[in-house]
Amino acid sequence: MKLRKLFREKVSFEKREKLKKIMHYKGDITYQKNVKPYIKGFLDGQKKEIETNKIIIESLHGKDISGHLFALASKLNNLNNYNVFIVAKDIERAQGILDVYNLKNIKLVKHMSYEYGLYLATAQILINDNTFYPFFSKREGQFYYNLWHGTPLKTLGKDIEGEFLEFGNTARNFMMTDSLYFSNKYSANKLLKSLDLDGVLKSNVYIAPSPRNSLLFDHDRCKKIKKELNIENKKIFIYMPTWRGNKKDKTINFTEENILSSLEKKLPNDVIVFYKLHSMITKNFKFKGDRVRPLPDSYDVYDFMSAVDGLITDYSSIMYDFASQDKKIILFTYDY
């Protein structure tokens, strides 16, 4: 009775009804295969042998090519005996990034396509910095490596108010991994506890250097980026707010637009602020001025940060990486 009462207190009526539908679902698998090509690809792939020379890299559900996995892909580009695929939602944008950085040996596969499902089922090596969606299940003979993308300064998993039991897919992904990589002990402890995996996870957990941080110290790239964008005589800042953990909050875009509009009006002429919003809120968001501009799609964010003079953020763990450069950090915590 206590468990039932706790469940009703923590889980809204709407979510309980949704859970009932899922538990009693008797859908036609043929329908699923026809409507969702990635499901068909994944199921077809179960009948095929695992390809030992194939590597799949997915960052933030295909929304970006950046950070740890961009740095890793740059190194894997030199391995001619592997077929390396990066998952991308926007193939044209992703191809532009590969072209800029001359990553000729890296191929692309469109997120949620038939080929995507097929490759997830047949690639021997799977690398992610977030999670694969719930339809994915690792086969025997596959190796799954997760390089978690951030340091959890805020709450995650069961610690997020109103998100009871919604961390299940993340926990499930972690349980399937062969190895988990974190840049510090704090991240490892915080994540595993918030996902209820502390003491039960069988994966190898490593505390290791951040591959993406090496990009911050490339002084040649710093000069080249400033020259390419004609900003050599400007003070450059990058604004990167974090995700606030609520997909239903429709005011987020409005808030960010107000912030950027205010900056555009008040910044002096010798200062430019480039912004990169969290991948969870960038859909349909557009703002561009003279002094406030979106981060160009053709640059990896860590590569670009080698050329900036300071970072503006709120709770984003990117501040920890940026601090290694000994540059200015402005914490703009307007909702603290």
Q: Can you describe what each PLM-predicted range is?
A:
Residues 1-53:
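Membrane-proximal basic amphipathic "stem/tether" segments
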Residues 41-51, 136, 171, 226-230, ...:
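Short boundary motifs at domain starts and secondary-structure transition points
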Residues 53-217:
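Active-site and donor-binding regions of nucleotide-sugar-utilizing enzymes
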Residues 65-74, 78, 210-286:
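Conserved catalytic-core segment of nucleotide-activated headgroup transferases in glycan assembly
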Residues 88-92, 279, 335:
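Residues in the short beta-alpha loop(s) of Rossmann-like NAD(P)-binding domains
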Residues 109-124, 279-320, 325:
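Donor nucleotide-activated moiety binding/catalytic core segment of transferases
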Residues 118-119, 137, 173, 230, ...:
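Structural alpha-helical scaffold elements that stabilize or flank donor/cofactor-binding regions
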Residues 125-155, 299-336:
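A donor-sugar binding/catalytic signature common to diverse glycosyltransferases
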